[in-house]
Amino acid sequence: MLKPQLQQSSQSTKALIPSWNTNPLFLASFPINILNKNFRLKKKNNFRVHHNYNGASTTKAVLSSTEKATGVKAVVTVQKQVNLNLSRGLDDIGDLLGKSLLLWIVAAELDHKTGIEKPGIRAYAHRGRDVDGDTHYEADFVIPQDFGEVGAILIENEHHKEMYVKNIVIDGFVHGKVEITCNSWVHSKFDNPDKRIFFTNKSYLPSQTPSGVSRLREEELVTLRGDGIGERKVFERIYDYDVYNDLGEADSNNDDAKRPVLGGKELPYPRRCKTGRPRSKKDPLSETRSTFVYVPRDEAFSEVKSVAFSGNTVYSVLHAVVPALESVVTDPNLGFPHFPAIDSLFNVGVDLPGLGDKKSGLFNVVPRLIKAISDTRKDVLLFESPQLVQRDKFSWFRDVEFARQTLAGLNPYSIRLVTEWPLRSKLDPKVYGPPESEITKELIEKEIGNYMTVEQAVQQKKLFILDYHDLLLPYVNKVNELKGSMLYGSRTIFFLTPQGTLKPLAIELTRPPVDDKPQWKEVYSPNDWNATGAWLWKLAKAHVLSHDSGYHQLVSHWLRTHCCTEPYIIASNRQLSAMHPIYRLLHPHFRYTMEINALAREALINANGVIESSFFPGKYAIELSSIAYGAEWRFDQEALPQNLISRGLAVEDPNEPHGLKLAIEDYPFANDGLVLWDILKQWVTNYVNHYYPQTNLIESDKELQAWWSEIKNVGHGDKRDEPWWPELKTPNDLIGIITTIVWVTSGHHAAVNFGQYSYAGYFPNRPTVARSKMPTEDPTAEEWEWFMNKPEEALLRCFPSQIQATKVMAILDVLSNHSPDEEYIGEKIEPYWAEDPVINAAFEVFSGKLKELEGIIDARNNDSKLSNRNGAGVMPYELLKPYSEPGVTGKGVPYSISI
């Protein structure tokens, strides 16, 4: 039986004593540069690791013919860069002279005679040939016989420009090659004189760290934490925390550009990465904004990525397409005059005359959106027909589809079981009016044809609700003061039919007291057997759908995946060494999340950005997500099984698959999600149990305990005193915590992100804002007459304006897009995992189970008994299929939140 961490693969790259070549001619051909015994890492005033190397004290040794040693070759793979500048010429000269990349090999263990670190072996790497678009640098070393295993390599980049180092392979050891995976930007020594540290691919708990690199391990973490002083520079890798205080312009004379600070007692929020930008002059709690938003260097989108990389497409749409649209649609309140005008977005397009010199680049980056019409020489924004309307153009109009999408649409996280009757608000009635709902027992029983009583329906788990009443009601009067948005608190009741589908029964819209008017509320039902009632129902649905769209984007998507994950990333880099096995397990799940979040703060969720200008809360959008965080977010309930239980959609049952019995058997998101959850959990279980075979290793792991403490007390510090935080004392505790995190970054995010264009690209299906009040709310005689004469126009006026709709459609298109280099879960093994045969085998099982899930989902989508994912014109539910081709496909589960 393989013992944890001890058994080695026959192809392991573990660095052992090299094979010795004692030929004196061979030895004499290799100079050895050995660092002095005082080789140290000093903490400078910014706490960056500094490797004290004095060239004058370094000796160039030539071994005698009796002194055993061997020559090894290190090959450094560097990815070619674009956007090169004038310093390239100087760097080319340095490459020719062989003085551009300096390496040190560091021994894994201390000198057993002296008890101190062994001298490092130094050599310059010379530029070699280019291979598959990468550049190889080669260095020759002579390794003394008593050097032992390689523990790390230090790099000094003597170019004037940073370089992206992919890996280093050292060949010549008797037991095979040593591989060191880097995948990191190495700064120029002209920006920062400190050397970079890269550890070997073997993972170690802190207590098992080889003695020769234990100090490097600790000091590298000190470097990554920084000292919290000053504005961060583009080449730095410092991870620190700050509140969301950069969404508005605190120094602006326009109050409409200012936003409150999110994070703290009044508006609790997760923390973001600290940039160190100067504070506002008028509000010292706020940070000034700038065009450059710092993220640690390795978190940024790589400039060597494909132009089709999703980050580039988002940037292009935000900074070129959206401004061009705004210049064309001069009236921001102009709606669509008729439904054919909406259809024209997909077959005629919108002229974009203002692209100018950005045009050629946009054709390459967003070819789905920007089309050149050759016969007219016009550039147009031409949308592709979303999958929903390709299958059934009128599906958005039907109640059965409205209900189905609560289980198999963009936002499957909001539907809840009704457990009490009658419905009551928990808000203060002195402020918001009577708490009792107007949805009566009689109405419900009438809508279900007296099939059963309300009491029986509640007892038998037949009633479900979309409840945005108490969350939205405190913001109704604030939002209604804004131009172009009309808000209500809403409740929508559904009935679970014998066929396993949901049937909408009633919508209640509520306005709290305002000025001298009392609370207003009204209930609408789909079976008002007259034309007026039918149109009122469609208008009420438009309001509810705008609420669900806003909640989806602000809470289910932004808050619960992007925003809440950033503290996990910061804590992991500050507290877990790069050689820690848990860091290496989590790392693929964190790629590019901080950069996409920074881009969101710059132009999506900022004051007057795309979200505020196009979704119903307007300037209160992100503030509303703070309210939801304070009232609803719990780490323990981010785990899919616990989330389903908390919403009444499942109960624990050991006799059922996944240990849960679902309240709605045909619940596509839950059905597929639970299979994926179990696959992730088994992978995490195998991984954790391998590195923590004894329970006491969890509590004694100082890095792990510091990591979890920092997540709870700093990253999510506004929730630090909550009793629901899991303990971290056993391997099972760790398995639960890690599985929850990786589920959020993979399955949860995929479920709420990659179907956005398919479901919401045709905006009548998912309007982001309702711009007009209900015709029955305090109407004048003229208003009522207009509605009675032009109900279709009333619905169109309620929908988003032309600029709101097209901006959101363009953004949703790129957010739903998979880049050609997308990294899907279980597709490729990480080099660190492949290093260990036990983890390698566990990954093969993980990958195989994910391929099986593909087949399971296909079979379910072809099962005619599953009406929530199969039927005439029904979109199959594929959002949790693990793999996808590039483009807008409505499927595919990447490791990380990179879009």
From Swiss-Prot:
Sequence similarity: Belongs to the lipoxygenase family.
Native source species: Solanum tuberosum
Keywords linked to the UniProt accession: Chloroplast, Dioxygenase, Fatty acid biosynthesis, Fatty acid metabolism, Iron, Lipid biosynthesis, Lipid metabolism, Metal-binding, Oxidoreductase, Oxylipin biosynthesis, Plastid, Thylakoid, Transit peptide
Residue ranges with Basic residues bias: 271-280
Further comment: 99% depletion of LOX-H1 by co-suppression-mediated gene silencing has no effect on the basal or wound-induced levels of jasmonates but results in a marked reduction in the production of volatile aliphatic C6 aldehydes.
Start and end residues of each Lipoxygenase domain: 203-899
pH dependence remark: Optimum pH is 7.0.
Name under which the protein is recorded: Linoleate 13S-lipoxygenase 2-1, chloroplastic
Residue numbers spanned by region Disordered: 252-287
Comment on bound cofactor: Binds 1 Fe cation per subunit.
Tissue distribution of the protein: Expressed in leaves and floral buds.
Cellular-component GO terms for this entry: chloroplast stroma; chloroplast thylakoid
Compartments it resides in: Plastid, Chloroplast stroma; Plastid, Chloroplast thylakoid
Quaternary assembly: Monomer.
GO MF terms held by the record: linoleate 13S-lipoxygenase activity; metal ion binding; oxidoreductase activity, acting on single donors with incorporation of molecular oxygen, incorporation of two atoms of oxygen
CDD domains per UniProt: PLAT_LH2 (cd01751)
UniProt-listed InterPro entries: LipOase, LipOase_C, LipOase_C_sf, LipOase_CS, LipOase_Fe_BS, LipOase_plant, Lipoxy_PLAT/LH2, Lipoxygenase_dom_3
Pathway(s) it belongs to: Lipid metabolism; oxylipin biosynthesis
PANTHER family membership: LIPOXYGENASE
Cofactor(s) the record lists: Fe cation
Gene: LOX2.1
PLAT domain span: 78-200
EC number per UniProt: 1.13.11.12
Lineage: Eukaryota, Viridiplantae, Streptophyta, Embryophyta, Tracheophyta
Residues binding Fe cation, per UniProt: H557, H562, H749, N753, I899
Task of the protein: Plant lipoxygenase involved in a number of diverse aspects of plant physiology including growth and development, pest resistance, and senescence. May not be involved in the bulk production of jasmonate upon wounding. Catalyzes the hydroperoxidation of lipids containing a cis,cis-1,4-pentadiene structure. Linolenic acid is the preferred substrate, before linoleic and arachidonic acids. Also has some activity with phosphatidylglycerol, but not with galactolipids.
